Amino acid sequence: MRIGLVELLLILLIASLTIGPSAALWVDRWMRRAQKTSAAAARRRAVQEAQRAAEREEVLQRFQKLSIVFVLCAAVALIWGLVLRPIEAAPTPYTAPDVRQETGAQNAAEGGVLELAPYTEISALRENNGWLYAAAKSGKNGCLLRMQPDGTGRTEVLTTAGEITDFAFAPDGTIWMTTLESEGGRLYRVNSDQWGVTVELTVSQIDGRALSCPTAVAAASDGAVYFTDLAAARARHGVESALRTELTAHTGTGSVYVYDPAARTVETVLTGIAGASGLALDEAAETLYVSDLGSRCVWAVDTAARDRTAGGKGCSTHLYGLPGYPGALALDADGTLYISYRWARSGWLEDHAGRTLLRGMALRLSQTMQEGLFSLSASDIRAEAVAPASGSWQRTIPGGSSGSTTALCPVGSRVYLAISGETKLHWVRV
């Protein structure tokens, strides 16, 4: 039987009237169920999101609290480290010295170098009977070397514990040597004969107080031995660190003493020095020249003087307003005085000469950071030569390389210089 269009439409109408309501009801129920499921999922997501937001807020609050605690602890540590932490040398206010005008002295002619490796930290130089002597470090020990001025024939004279800070020859060949050891400073007498070298401790304390840091020594023909003590504060990290400490603190507690080997007594020659860093003895003029590190000057005092104060009666400022902080001193055969400079003048330090708080903070910095406060560049003056009688400047020795000047020694037409951190000696022609 054929179904026409009318019949087909009637069948579809009857089917829709019969099945349609049930299908519509089923679709409606399915849609409602889907909507409920979606709403429940949305509510669960909302709850989870709220929980996550609450957790984030709690973590953030904890982090903020920890950050505040950390900042407070860091601030307390910083205040303690830079302001409240005890230091051995409390800074004192002082008046910064003037700056000297240009002298017009000629530059020394270029020379050369002598390599001393494996020896390091050359701290003192002397000439005796045509030989050049040098104090250096060999491992952890101090070592005294002897060589020809051209570096040949190098031998070890002796080794000792600690750091040899300076040495001097007496007319009878005795070597007087100052050292810095773990127990403090020492003054030794060194004798040598066919049996070898003997080292005798002569001074380790003065009036019951241990030597802090003897930095220079000079021996007179009458047997008297003059030596310096850098400052009252103990040097725990070597001479270089002790010099920076006194330069920053400017305690003015450095001294010069004289030891009488016959009587075994020690007398005070000069006090009130802001870093007694160098010493030279002119026996013809009966004068001691003393480097004052912090005051940028050289004092002159009679060898017979006792209990004098720097700048007081019987102690005049022989050279002042120097371009750097003076260290080792030396006299040549003609009486010319050579002055070495540890560092160039620090504008920051002297601008804050009267401000103990900032200088106290600088004293509490690490050793590496303190080293950045002072420098001597290749363009600065490393050493100078002056005629003490007339005060006329003879020669200027330029920096050449960076690093503080630790020692110098005139030998004939040459001047030898040692620079911190190097294993070689520099020399120039004068």
Give residue spans per PLM region.
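Short, Lys/Arg-rich N-terminal segment immediately upstream of the first membrane anchor
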Residues: M1, A53-R62, Y133
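Hydrophobic single transmembrane helices highlighted by the model
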Residues: M1-S22
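Intrinsic disorder/low-complexity segments enriched in polar/small residues
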Residues: L8, E49-A50, K65, P149, ...
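Cytosolic-side junction of a single-pass transmembrane alpha-helix
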Residues: S16-Q35
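N-terminal intrinsically disordered, acidic low-complexity segments at the extreme N-terminus
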Residues: W30-Q51
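Internal/C-terminal transmembrane anchor helices
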Residues: L60-V83
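Sequence-structural signature of mature extracellular/luminal beta-sheet repeat domains
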Residues: W80-V430
